[in-house]
UniProtKB/Swiss-Prot annotation:
It is found in: Virion. It comes from Lymantria dispar multicapsid nuclear polyhedrosis virus (LdMNPV). Transmembrane segments: none annotated. Keywords: Capsid protein, Late protein, Virion. One of its GO terms (molecular function) is structural molecule activity. This is Major capsid protein. The gene is P39. Pfam families: Baculo_VP39. Its main location: virion. The keyword Iron-sulfur does not apply. One of its GO terms (cellular component) is viral capsid. Expressed late in infection. InterPro entries: Baculo_VP39.
């Protein structure tokens, strides 16, 4: 009978969304998470499709890349929800530390959502301001503090997974991205100044125009659909994008709207409905920018673990060397292979450790 560790089953994350722990700081009613069903899937985004849509105007898609034998390498790509008529700051998808409060309209969020957003942008001062505001609640000591602490700990655990400096981080590091080819490199500098969570989000949401694998280059697209500038990740190319957001409401029914929209009218012949039998080409705006280089070799250092026979041979060699008379000097030998030197060094270190 196989034994299964209890920690592996009880501590498994059931929600990989950074907003998954958000709940009102009022314990009077039960609260269900608004996260979309994909929050249970560890797809590397660490934010569900719902929150990615309403906060960063991006929905998830997959980019299947087939090879010569029919095998498919799947890569995620974000779908822009920015309409072609949108102008100005409303075209910013992922803002920077300098403008995220205005772009994300932070004042319209609840205190719990504000706290998570400040944690994403690593704004410690703003996090403290939210905690001070919570202290005015009469139930702060008995209930509110416990809820805030639980939400903070769960959100911190998700954010830690996106930090490449963390031990055993889940962020993929076997690739390199080049965002721009100009000498100024504004896109690269802005990207490096982003917090770890947003750097990972941009990496998984923005697919490359070109993918370099060993000596092969796959040209997926020959022009970008977005850009990274001083305001963040921006859908700067005004492509026709009539997409309807799956989760966001685009208008308020209580407010009168006057629209000037494009409309097609005509019979089946005029609209060429007979062509609907063919495979449709979707009019969407995938986020694509720069070049990605995939490293096919392992990023971890390879080494050989010594066996029991190796240690026995080492003991015999050590005892024979101590009993034998000194040998005459031999001619200098050629350089030994690096793998052999590393293997012998491992055995010697183990022998010194045993002799202590």
């Amino acid at each position: 009978m196989a034994l299964v560790s209890g920690a592996l089953s009880t501590n498994r994350l059931r929600n990989y969304c950074v907003f998954g722990a958000v709940q009102p700081f009022d314990n009077c009613r039960a609260y269900g998470s608004p996260c979309s069903p994909d929050s249970t899937n560890n797809d590397g985004w660490f934010i569900c499709d719902y929150h990615s849509s309403i906060r960063f105007k991006i929905e998830k898609m997959v980019l299947p890349i087939p090879d010569a034998e029919g095998n498919i390498y799947n890569r995620t790509v974000g779908k822009s929800l920015v309409n072609h008529k949108t102008l100005g700051a409303a075209r910013v998808l992922i803002p920077t530390r300098d403008n995220y409060k205005t772009v994300l309209n932070l004042n319209s969020m609840s205190l719990a959502e504000q706290l998570v957003t400040h944690m994403i942008y690593d704004n410690v001062e703003a996090q403290g301001a939210v905690c001070k505001a919570l202290q005015h609640n009469e139930n702060f000591q008995t209930e509110t503090y416990r809820l805030a602490e639980d939400m903070f700990n769960r959100t911190s655990a998700i954010l830690a997974m996106t930090n490449p400096r963390r031990y055993c981080s889940q962020v993929n590091s076997n690739y390199a991205r080049i965002w721009t080819t100009d000498d100024v490199n504004v896109a690269g500098n802005v990207f490096e100044s982003m917090p770890p969570f947003l750097k990972n989000l941009i990496n998984v949401a923005v697919a490359p125009e070109q993918i370099m694998i060993d000596e092969k280059t796959l040209v997926i697209r020959n022009c970008p659909t977005c850009n990274i500038d001083d305001s963040g990740l921006v859908a700067n190319v005004q492509l026709y994008n009539p997409v309807v957001p799956r989760y966001r409401s685009t208008f308020n029914e209580n407010v009168l709207h006057v629209e000037n929209v494009l409309k097609f009218k005509g019979n089946a012949n005029a609209l060429q409905k007979s062509l609907s039998r063919y495979e449709p080409y979707p009019i969407v705006v995938p986020l694509m920018l720069g070049t990605q280089t995939l490293n096919t070799s392992s990023a971890y250092k390879q080494f050989t673990v010594p066996t029991r026979d190796d240690f026995a041979a080492l003991n015999q060699r050590t005892g024979a060397a101590a009993a034998a008379p000194p040998a005459p000097a031999a001619a200098p030998a050629g350089p030994r292979p690096a793998a052999e030197l590393e293997y012998d060094e491992t055995l010697d270190r183990f022998a010194r450790w045993r002799a202590r």
